[in-house]
Each structure stands twice: as structure tokens, then as C-alpha cells.
């Protein structure tokens, strides 16, 4: 369904806050969000991770992250993400712009030290390139899931809200 509000309207809300100027994370869910928490990374630009619990009907935790552009800061942020993910008891979906300019090897530590899997990346023949939005040639955006999440479909949506195209998954929670 087409979104009714232009991107320029949203950007005007953040122009006076330097760290939010033209940067934002968003989480949209058809299910009620019952818990929300914000984690601010200690390294790099003060970007945050949104942690939200939804019930569909089983509780799952969604994490939305936007990692740093600099490789050194990004590596430290990945270490922080490992701690955040491992502290969660529910099934987890971690998604966001990981800025992995040097390839998937950059998130290897995250995958090895948590229970998360790159279900989309397992389908190597059809990786979802999302950046730049006007001619996608890079995979910087990821959706990682715990083993109790079964991804049935994924797609790149043709909405030009930023320099990246959004990813969408359809999933079930295994019992």
C-alpha cells in the first residue's frame, strides 16, 4: 500500500538535531508492540538500536540497527550487538543497514557468536541488493533471524525513502 506522507515532511522534523539530520531508523509492524527499548552504541556516530517486542501470537524481539560507516567503529558496534542479541530470550529478528562495504565477512563474528542466521544470504543466487536505491549494486542491508523464525519470502520494495531500498520478509515462528 502506498505511503501517504512525502519523505520531505519527515526530514523537516529532524533538521535541527545534528545527529538525526537525514538519518533515522524505523520499525513498522502490523502486530502490537508491547515493549520498546533503545540502545545507543558507544562507538562511532551516536546511532541507536531499536529493540521492540511484538506478539504474533508468540512474543518475538525485533532489533533495528544502523551501523557506522567507519570499519573500526563498525567492528566495535558488532561486538555490542552480540551482547544485545545474546541477552534476549525470545526469538530474534535483527535488521538494518550494516554498511558492510567489505562484504559479508564483516558480520561473521555476529553470526558465529549469536544464534542468528542470514536466511536471505543462504539463497546466494538471488541476493537482495538495496544500495544505492536508484541502481542497487550492493548488499549493505540485512535481516538476520534466530532458528525459530522461518522466512517464507523476502523482497526488496520499490520505495525511494532513502539511498537504500527497504527489505521486507514474511515469516512464521516455529513452535
Residues covered by each model-derived region:
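Conserved hydrophobic/aromatic beta-strand scaffold that supports enzyme active sites
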Residues: 25-27, 49-53, 64, 142-143, ...
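Alpha-helical elements of Rossmann-like donor-binding domains used by nucleotide-donor carbohydrate transfer enzymes
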Residues: 51, 76-81, 105, 109
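Active-site metal-binding loops of divalent metal-dependent hydrolases
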Residues: 66-67, 96-98
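Structured beta-strand-rich core segments of catalytic domains in phosphoester-bond hydrolases
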Residues: 1-59, 157-158
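Surface-exposed cleft-lining segments at the edges of enzyme active sites
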Residues: 37-40, 64-72
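A long, amphipathic alpha-helix that forms part
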Residues: 74-90
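Solvent-exposed loop/turn segments connecting transmembrane beta-strands
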Residues: 42-46, 70-74, 159-163
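Metal-dependent phosphoester-hydrolase catalytic domains
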Residues: 38, 86-92, 99-175
Amino acid at each position: 500500500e502506498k505511503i501517504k506522507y512525502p519523505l520531505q515532511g519527515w526530514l523537516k522534523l529532524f533538521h535541527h538535531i545534528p545527529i538525526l539530520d537525514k538519518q533515522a531508523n524505523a520499525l513498522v509492524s502490523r502486530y502490537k508492540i508491547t515493549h520498546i527499548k533503545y540502545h545507543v552504541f558507544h562507538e562511532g556516530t551516536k546511532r541507536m538500536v531499536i529493540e521492540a517486542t511484538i506478539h504474533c501470537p508468540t512474543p518475538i524481539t525485533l532489533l533495528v540497527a544502523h551501523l557506522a560507516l567507519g570499519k573500526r567503529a563498525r567492528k566495535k558496534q558488532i561486538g555490542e550487538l552480540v551482547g544485545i542479541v545474546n541477552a534476549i530470550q525470545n526469538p530474534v529478528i535483527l535488521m538494518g543497514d550494516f554498511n558492510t562495504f567489505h562484504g559479508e565477512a564483516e558480520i561473521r563474528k555476529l553470526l558465529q557468536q549469536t544464534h542468528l542466521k542470514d536466511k536471505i544470504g543462504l539463497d546466494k543466487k538471488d541476493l537482495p541488493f538495496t544500495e544505492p536505491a536508484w541502481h542497487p549494486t550492493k548488499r549493505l542491508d540485512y535481516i538476520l533471524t534466530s532458528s525459530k523464525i522461518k522466512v517464507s519470502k523476502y523482497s526488496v520494495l520499490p520505495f525511494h525513502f532513502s539511498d537504500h531500498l527497504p527489505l521486507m520478509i514474511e515469516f512464521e515462528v516455529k513452535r
